[in-house]
Each structure stands twice: as C-alpha cells, then as structure tokens.
A protein has these predicted regions:
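Short clusters of hydrophobic/aromatic residues that line enzyme substrate/ligand-binding pockets
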Residues: 20, 29-30, 76, 96-99
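N-terminal accessory segments
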Residues: 1-34, 40, 59-67
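N-terminal glycine-rich flavin-associated loop
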Residues: 12, 35-67, 85, 89-121
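Short glycine-biased active-site loop of nucleotidyltransferases that positions the nucleotide triphosphate
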Residues: 34-36, 76-81
Length: 121
C-alpha cells in the first residue's frame, strides 16, 4: 500500500465509530469468500452506523477506490472480494427495522441472517 493512503486510512479510523482494519491478517481473512477468487483488499471496515457508511463512501470517492459490501462471505462468484475496502455489515447492521403485516413486508438491515429473521417472525 502507498504511504499516503495508509496515513489516510489511519485518519479515517479515528473518525469511525465502528472498526477499520488495514493489517495483513484481517486483509488476508477478507481476501476470499466461498468462491475460488482471491483479492487482497485495501482495508476491512465494520461500520457501526449510517454515518460510518457515509464516511466510507466519502473516503472511497475522494481516493478513487471501491467499496465491496459483505456479510457472510458465502458468495460462490467472488462478488465480495476486491482490491478496495471491504465493508462487512454483519457485525453491527443486524436489526429488524419494521414489520408491516398488512403489506406483508419486512425491512431489515443488511446484516440480518435469514434464519434469525425466520425465528423472529
């Protein structure tokens, strides 16, 4: 990684309420999913709230890098691996937000696991 982007990632880390990892171990853990593909990401973010997501989007836009959304990493086609910042929402974005029985809809955060939703219903 370039020294400048490393400094910028450290600065970003101080503004997030969630977690941001750029160490080799975390990057290697998130370099693959259930597919055969492997790409070492720039960093791994575990945002805690919507503001963290906004800060990550602003950072990616400013530094011309991608954000790769991820939850369980069960993709068989490599959608959640890449050279940008992996954004893992499975730790903090796990709330069921709304159940509308008349419309038969449920609004959830992206980290909600299907089995947990089924148990809740």
């Amino acid at each position: 990684m370039q020294n400048e982007i490393v400094k910028e990632l450290k600065a970003l880390r101080t503004t997030l309420e969630g977690d941001l990892h750029s160490d080799d171990l975390m990057r290697k853990l998130y370099a693959t999913d259930a597919s055969v593909y492997r790409k070492l990401p720039l960093a791994v973010a575990l945002p805690k709230n919507n503001n963290d997501i906004k800060l990550l989007i602003d950072f990616a836009k400013t530094h011309h890098t991608s954000l790769i959304p991820r939850t369980a990493g069960t993709s068989l086609a490599g959608q959640c691996v890449g050279e940008g910042i992996v954004v893992d929402v499975s730790k903090y974005f796990t709330r069921i937000l709304d159940i509308n029985e008349s419309d038969k809809t449920v609004t959830v955060q992206p980290g909600v696991v299907r089995d947990e939703l089924n148990n809740y219903l």
